[in-house]
Amino acid sequence: MKAVYPGSFDPITLGHVDIIKRALSIFDELVVLVTENPRKKCMFTLEERKKLIEEVLSDLDGVKVDVHHGLLVDYLKKHGIKVLVRGLRAVTDYEYELQMALANKKLYSDLETVFLIASEKFSFISSSLVKEVALYGGDVTEWVPPEVARALNEKLKEGKR
């Protein structure tokens, strides 16, 4: 069975990678779908994020990385995918994700959303936190894959925030 794990992944963190690996133990195929979020100001372009994720996940079988503009359910319907994977870190994540799952189900009745609880050691990590700490010169190497740490350093040297 195929599932999609969508997100802005700006940038991908070790928490995301953990969810991806755990989802792969449940599903035969997983599409990591890089999406736009108009409410977020992204440091990396969609294509940069896609490339970074492909580098980070290159040793995993059963993973495809794709990019999508627009409604998530449109992508799912187009590709015949009926399962959505989401990670939950805290109660605040649950409230938002429940609302999104119900809205997506209304738009695509065949869709099921599977929630994976974040592993405790990654439960505090978010892409926003990673960017903020990196911006102020903090060490984020325990929160992101090495490829991402390098890309963050390069972006910050360019002055892109």
From Swiss-Prot:
The keyword Nucleotide-binding applies. ATP binds at S8, F9, H16, G87, L88, R89, E97, F122, S123, F124, I125, S126, S127, S128. It is an enzyme of class 2 (transferase). InterPro entries: Cyt_trans-like (IPR004821), PPAT (IPR001980), Rossmann-like_a/b/a_fold (IPR014729). One of its GO terms (cellular component) is cytoplasm. The record marks H16 as: Transition state stabilizer. Its cofactor is Mg(2+). GO terms for molecular function: ATP binding; pantetheine-phosphate adenylyltransferase activity. It catalyses: (R)-4'-phosphopantetheine + ATP + H(+) = 3'-dephospho-CoA + diphosphate. Gene3D superfamilies: HUPs. GO terms for biological process: coenzyme A biosynthetic process. Substrate binds at S8, E36, N37, P38, R39, K40, L72, R86, E132. The keyword ATP-binding applies. Pfam families: CTP_transf_like. It is found in: Cytoplasm. Homohexamer. PANTHER family: PHOSPHOPANTETHEINE ADENYLYLTRANSFERASE. Belongs to the bacterial CoaD family. This is Phosphopantetheine adenylyltransferase. It comes from Thermotoga maritima (strain ATCC 43589 / DSM 3109 / JCM 10099 / NBRC 100826 / MSB8).
